Regions:
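Catalytic Walker B motif of ABC-type/P-loop ATPase nucleotide-binding domains
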Residues: 158-161
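Helix-to-loop junction immediately C-terminal to a conserved catalytic motif
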Residues: 48
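Conserved ABC transporter NBD signature motif
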Residues: 56-65
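Conserved structural motif at the start of ABC-family nucleotide-binding domains
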Residues: 2-4, 17-19
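Helix N-cap at the start of a conserved alpha-helix in ABC-type nucleotide-binding domains
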Residues: 169-171
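Conserved ABC ATPase signature
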Residues: 133-137, 141-143
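Conserved signature/switch motifs of ABC ATPase nucleotide-binding domains
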Residues: 132-135, 153-154, 185
Length: 236
């Protein structure tokens, strides 16, 4: 489970959120919706403790921001899969090697690497592209490689920051479907996006950063409708 307890989040001494109280349950699908610069990336970074609260506490799968040491942060991040908007793939290595690299760095037994890599690629429909170079793939395919890379280490949660930001509408829907498929296997998936209309067609628990507030509801109606409740004051 992930929990924010009276947490204040700042970036470069600029207040972003105040008195944030929020729980994310194991296996949950959660959207965080907000415009560029609204604070959603800060919120996502705090999940893997790249951003630490200046007050209060964040607890991520048993690791507390108050007590965790730098060495333990690396251990925590191994339990999480991170999906970036800009792919960050190694262009001089094949799709297979991009995933295998993650496993080698984390000390996975050599005998298990091929099976884990191919299983992850199969989850995103790219087992046929294992030998391809990333730059030879479409944008949507590259993002699917990024998702497979996040998945290959058997994470308890996947954190995706604008995973559809550089993609056309049809490909964006396809990427969300792959993330939902992963979530259906019991893996928590937290998605940050600026695209409210895209999320509307994929109902789930949603946080929206709107009018300098973080509000929450199941997204089945417009954000001006009933059912939204404050979660924290956002000062972005």
């Amino acid at each position: 489970m992930i929990a924010f307890v009276n947490a204040d989040l700042d970036i470069r001494k600029k207040p972003i959120f105040r008195n944030l109280n929020l729980s994310i349950q194991p296996g949950e699908l959660l959207y965080i919706v907000g415009r560029s610069g609204s604070g959603k990336t800060t919120l996502l970074k705090s999940l893997y403790m790249e951003v630490m609260p200046v007050k209060g506490e964040i607890v991520v799968h048993g690791y507390s921001s108050r007590k965790i040491r730098k060495g333990k942060i690396a251990m925590l991040r191994r339990k999480l899969g991170i999906v970036f908007q800009d792919f960050r793939l190694l262009e001089d290595r094949s799709v297979y090697d991009n995933l295998a690299f993650v496993l080698k760095v984390t000390g996975t037994k050599h005998s298990l690497i091929e099976e884990k890599v191919m299983t992850a690629l199969k989850e995103v429909g790219l087992e046929h592209a294992a030998k391809e170079m990333p730059q030879n793939l479409s944008g949507g395919e590259q993002q699917r490689v990024v998702i497979a890379r996040a998945l290959v280490g058997d994470p308890v949660a996947i954190i995706a920051d604008e995973p559809t930001g550089n993609l056309d509408p049809d490909t964006s829907i396809e990427i969300l479907e792959y993330l939902k498929k992963i979530n259906a296997k019991g893996i928590s998936v937290i998605i940050g996006t600026h695209d409210y209309e895209l999320v509307r067609h994929h109902p789930s628990r949603t946080l929206m950063i709107s009018d300098k507030n973080l509000v929450e509801c199941t997204i089945e109606a417009a954000p001006t409708g009933s059912g939204w409740r404050p979660v924290a004051k956002a000062t972005a």
